[in-house]
Regions:
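Long, low-complexity, charged/polar intrinsically disordered regions in eukaryotic proteins
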Residues: 1-36
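Intrinsic disorder
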Residues: 32, 52, 63-67
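Short helix->loop/beta-hairpin flanking segments within DNA-binding domains
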Residues: 35-51
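Short acidic, hydrophobic short linear motifs in intrinsically disordered regions
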Residues: 48-61
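Short amphipathic alpha-helical interaction segments
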Residues: 63-78
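A short, conserved structural fragment
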Residues: 77-88
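Minor-groove-contacting beta-hairpin "wing" of winged helix-turn-helix DNA-binding domains
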Residues: 88-95
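Short, amphipathic alpha-helical interaction segments positioned at domain boundaries
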Residues: 95-112
Length: 112
């Protein structure tokens, strides 16, 4: 593992998407994103279409905490639904982000 890489895993518990991170240096941490927030992020991406976005632009647009948006975007990126676009931005890899996001969320909830 390179110096700045992390071990990142996702789980679903009690209606929340949980992102657990174990950095190579520092303390492990976790952040949560309620399912309704994940849905709002996914719908916002669908509405943006081909337009790129950042954590902060989605957080501001949807009036959500940036940590919840960061969890949602990390999950969508890990599942191949969005990709990194330039240094701090993202772009959808396909149409139907909400449908794919909910499919992946429920699969994770059922299968771990």
């Amino acid at each position: 593992m390179a110096p700045h890489e992390t071990n990142e895993t996702f789980a679903v518990f009690d209606g929340h998407l949980i992102r657990k991170v174990v950095p190579r240096r520092g303390q492990p941490y976790e952040h949560r994103c309620p399912r309704p927030s994940l849905e709002r992020v996914a719908h916002a991406i669908d509405e943006l279409g081909d337009e790129g976005f950042t954590i902060h632009s989605i957080a501001e647009r949807e009036d959500l905490p940036s940590t919840q948006v960061a969890v949602a975007l990390a999950f969508l990126r890990e599942r191949g639904i969005i990709e990194t676009h330039y240094r701090h931005g993202y772009a959808a890899t396909q149409v139907g982000v909400h449908l794919d996001a909910m499919t992946e969320y429920h699969a994770l909830a059922e299968n771990g």
